[in-house]
A protein has these predicted regions:
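Residue-level detector of functionally pivotal "anchor" positions at catalytic/ligand-binding pockets or at interdomain
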Residues: 27-29, 214-222, 643-666, 731
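Charged, low-complexity intrinsically disordered terminal segments
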Residues: 305-378, 385-398, 419-663, 672-677, ...
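Surface-exposed, short loops/turns at beta-strand junctions within beta-sandwich domains
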Residues: 179, 273-281, 703-709
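C-terminal outer-membrane/trafficking sorting elements
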Residues: 1, 7, 15-19, 249, ...
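Structural beta-strand segments of beta-rich domains
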Residues: 41, 232-236, 664-668
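OB-fold single-stranded nucleic acid-binding module
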Residues: 26-217, 293, 381
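Short, surface-exposed linear motifs at loops/turns and structural transition points
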Residues: 215-306
Length: 731
């Protein structure tokens, strides 16, 4: 029986033969969105776009929105106009994260020229599943880059937050000038995320130039930045497009209730909150008022500095190269890092919280048992999918909570909190190492120790969110892991003279925070990563490299599924594949501008691998340490890892080789004492890119055709010895 398709002014008649599949009751869109993929639903809504977005349509009622795509097997003729009220029937489908009805099994146009739903006013960070398929509005948006709109994805920012818009090839905005000033952006919240499961990729789809409204109201033109952190208080600073008041609502709870600031009009705003006390957590929201308009910042939890000035120390479990030190030699605890961890646990006098992915070391477990014996309250969280066989040696008085609903790597944290309530003895142990024999003794890892009460209290908040309460025993019914967690901790801490940032995954947008720092690197980025599959961070590295930043690193496995290794090396970035070594390179760190006096030397480290799952489903902890001494120590560790590939190494004996110039460009002169039989240049993946036979002690290589970057020089001498050295070609 043929499908009846509406002529202008007519409605679709659903054929009798389809009725058995369509007898499910009419649903509002919010209810329909809860049904299983593949369920046939019937919904009614107002169409919020026309052909400007292609053949897809978005429908919205008073409860939610949804996409409708007339894919293969759809009835013909589905092309309703914006403002029409339409009833649609079809199965639910998930397309790269976007929930849609596809195919269209039947539809009726019920009415036309209806007013569109009012857009939901939100911030970039509030784009998400709750508003997918709905009209949204983000005020005070600035587009980056200038020029004209390209097809594909572009980025906009508002109140210091970033989000994408997407324009398909046939969109009317493609080729139009990008607004130079602030605009209020209107569009439909959509999603494009190829991950499994898809949890990100939310974007705004403007429908035309009318969705870019010049902003005539006061808006924030920057994020709210916490500065001047002291034990007594801190200052919040921000800027607006128009002159308005400088005010902050604040309080000990999210209800706020107290106010500070000035009504004097200004564009650059600064409000000091004082009298708060040391290691105090305060909820605050900055805002500026101009007439009847108010520009709001986000409500955020902030911390004052601790009463006792703290410090940051770093210990590595493998060799370091102190010859490159610019001040403080790095500490290598070869074979004894478990003893170092146990020694800090021995400091605990009142409380000890442990959240570690996997444990097989009895020295550490013994130190925890000793802490319990001297009256310390001990709590432990671990990943339930792991063996954790050393936990069988824990005293029965130590409660252990396992995360058992674990996609990805699950409870992947590696941290210990000691005496968080003691201003003089509060410590946090973090870094990349699990408490396993392999991680502690073989696999290159780092241990970061921070003595600071405010940071310890923040880590305790995170621990107790997973623990399910504040008591000595876990409350599994209340515990939150993974995507159920909230962004409930401060992020900036003044530890002595060092600024330390703290982020927990997946609630805190850790990948975004890492990218923000990569985007402002001035001169150098060194990486030591277990895995690199996160495309957002890949793109940041590519952009930094294109901007002249020297990007180089070591990655444990270049061939891991989804690896970005070869994308980066093909762009000229110096990366080394560690997979040939028997141990795992387990680090997750980046060093930025370690020797740049005009930059901000910092280190990003913790449990957070540079992967999609680390940012979206795993429990992770990350520290960003702004300190030139710490950056210098990590660079000493990184140099030792790099030297495993590129330092002068020799097979079958010893003997020096010399190269000139450094770096080389059109040519490279190589000299070896015992005479050269053959010289080879290998790129960072081990591929031979140049080979020359030699007869004397010196050989000239022609290298103009080679790409700039790092190479391994391999020299075979007459004696039979083979020497290797790192060489660099100038860009």
């Amino acid at each position: 029986m043929p499908i009846a398709v509406p002529l202008p002014g007519m409605r679709v008649l659903l054929p009798f033969l389809l009725l058995p599949a369509l007898l499910n009751a009419q649903s509002d869109i919010a209810e329909a969105r809860t049904y299983a993929i593949g369920s046939v639903v019937t919904i009614t809504g107002i169409v919020t776009n026309g052909p400007e977005l292609g053949s897809i349509r978005y429908l919205q009622d008073g409860t939610a929105g949804i996409a409708v795509f007339p894919g293969s097997s759809s009835v013909p003729g589905f092309a309703p106009a914006s403002g029409q009220e339409v009833q649609v029937t079809g199965p639910l489908k998930l397309f790269n994260g976007l929930l849609e009805i596809d195919p269209v099994m039947g539809f009726q146009v019920l009415s036309s020229n209806n007013p569109l739903p009012a857009p939901q006013l939100l911030t970039p960070n509030e784009l998400g599943e709750d508003v997918e398929g709905m009209l949204v509005r983000v005020n005070g948006c600035q587009f980056t880059g200038g020029g004209t709109f390209p097809s594909g994805t572009s980025t906009f920012s508002s109140i210091g937050q970033n989000a994408p818009i997407y324009l398909w090839n046939g969109h009317s905005l493609v080729g139009d000038p990008v607004p130079g000033g602030l605009v209020d952006l209107i569009g439909i919240c959509s999603q494009y995320d190829t991950g499994n499961p898809p949890v990100g990729g939310y974007q705004v789809l403007p429908r035309g130039s009318g969705d870019l409204v010049p902003s005539t109201t006061i808006n924030l033109t920057s994020g709210v930045e916490q500065q001047a952190i002291t034990p007594d208080g801190f200052t919040l600073s921000w800027s607006t497009n128009l002159a308005g008041s400088s005010e902050v609502a604040w309080g000990p709870t999210p209800a706020l209730g107290s106010f500070a600031g000035s009504g004097t009009p200004a564009i650059a705003h600064s409000v000091a909150l004082t009298g708060l006390g040391p290691a105090a957590f305060v909820h605050a929201r900055a805002f500026s008022v101009l007439g009847s308009d108010t520009a709001w910042g986000e409500r955020t939890l902030y911390s004052t500095a601790s009463a006792v000035p703290g410090w940051v120390r770093v210990v590595f479990n493998r060799e370091v190269d102190t010859s490159v030190s610019q001040g403080t030699p790095a500490v290598s605890a070869l074979g004894s890092i478990a003893d170092s961890i146990a020694a800090y646990i021995d400091l605990a006098q009142s409380t000890l919280d442990v959240a570690v992915y996997n444990t097989s070391n009895y020295t550490i477990v013994g130190a925890v048992n000793d802490a319990l014996a001297r009256g310390v309250q001990v709590r432990w969280i671990a990943e339930g999918a792991n063996a954790n066989f050393a936990l069988s040696a824990l005293n029965n008085g130590v409660p252990v909570l396992y995360r058992t609903n674990s996609p990805g790597s699950g409870m992947h944290n590696k941290f210990v909190v000691i005496d968080a309530d003691d201003p003089a003895n509060a410590h946090v142990l973090s870094g990349s190492t699990n408490f396993t024999q392999g991680n502690l003794f073989d696999d290159p890892n780092n241990l970061v120790i921070v003595r600071d009460q405010a940071l310890a209290l923040a880590y305790t908040l995170e621990f107790e969110e997973m623990w399910g309460g504040t008591g000595p025993q876990p409350v599994p019914a209340n515990s939150r892991f993974g995507e159920d967690k909230t962004d409930n901790t401060p992020h900036r801490f003044q530890v002595g003279g060092t600024l330390v940032e703290s982020f927990f995954s997946p609630s805190d947008g850790t990948t975004h925070a890492i990218r923000e720092h990569l985007d402002v690197a001035q001169s150098s980025i060194e990486l030591a990563l277990f895995i690199l599959t996160e495309n957002t961070l890949r793109d940041a590295l590519l952009e930094a490299h294109a901007d002249g930043v020297w990007v180089r690193g070591v990655v444990d496995d270049a061939n891991a599924p989804g690896s970005d290794f070869f994308t980066l090396t093909s762009a000229g970035i110096d990366l080394y594949d560690h997979s040939a070594f028997p141990e795992l390179l387990h680090h997750k760190y980046a060093i930025l501008d370690h020797s740049d006096p005009g930059g901000d030397p910092l280190v990003i480290t913790g449990s957070h691998n540079w992967t999609f799952s680390a940012n979206t489903v795993n429990d992770e902890n990350t520290l960003i340490i702004h300190d030139p001494a710490v950056a210098d120590q990590f660079f000493q560790e990184w140099t030792a890892r790099r030297d495993a590939f590129t330092g002068v190494a020799e097979v079958g004996g010893k003997g020096p080789i010399a190269t000139w110039p450094v770096p080389f460009h059109e040519g490279l002169q190589v000299t070896a004492d015992d005479g050269i039989v053959e010289v080879r240049l290998l790129d960072t993946t081990g591929r031979i890119v140049l080979a020359e036979a030699g007869q004397g002690p010196t050989i000239q290589l022609r290298t103009a055709h080679l790409a700039g970057g790092g190479y391994v020089l391999e020299v075979r001498e007459r004696s039979g010895r083979t020497l290797r050295s790192n060489v660099v070609k100038a860009p």
